[in-house]
Amino acid sequence: MPITTTRQQDTALFVAAFFDEMVRWGVCEVVVSPGSRSTALAMAAYELEQRRPQDLRVYVDIDERGAAFLGLGLAKASGRPVALVCTSGTALANYYPAVIEAETSRVPLIVLSGDRPPQLQGLGAPQTTDQLKAYGNHVRSFRAMPTPRGRDRDIAFARQAAREAVLAAVSYTHLRAHETSQDL
């Protein structure tokens, strides 16, 4: 009998694989600006830090602009990509000055933003901003992550996306992940 999972479990497995792969490829620090849409991302980072504190350090800053510049400073100091995690809506916009600075200074940053599911885009739902090309030409790559469905290929995709993000973050990358709670 096949094992069934919930959307939250599918998302948790997806983002856990994503963070595990980022760490494997050299990301040692994550700065989280907590918010409801990025809960799965924040929890995956925190849980990985708890399991492997020698491999990952997670910082929390409720001010998105300050968090982004903290991440920028950490990346400048280490020369390694730092991941920034924020929720949807205008939180993403508050990272913009640091993203521009990262591009100008050639500092490796990876922005991971939570988002509403695609079916709520463009309908006036709160905390919904068109994230496609939100940073314009200031990032090397943008990828909208699919909604995980609990398939093995979802995990493979998460790992591939993480590798590509780290490799592209020789400067700057932005990935958007959909929040998948039952109470949309």
Predicted segments, located by residue:
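Thiamine diphosphate
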Residues: 2-88
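Short acidic, glycine/serine/threonine-rich loops at helix termini
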Residues: 41-45, 72, 95-97, 121-125
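Hydrophobic/aromatic ligand-binding patch that stacks against planar heteroaromatic rings
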Residues: 70-74, 98-101, 134-135, 168
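Active-site-proximal loop->helix
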Residues: 73, 117-134
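Conserved thiamine diphosphate
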Residues: 80, 128-172
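Hydrophobic or amphipathic alpha-helical targeting/insertion segments
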Residues: 100-118, 138
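Conserved small/polar residues in nucleotide/adenosyl-binding loops
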Residues: 173-180
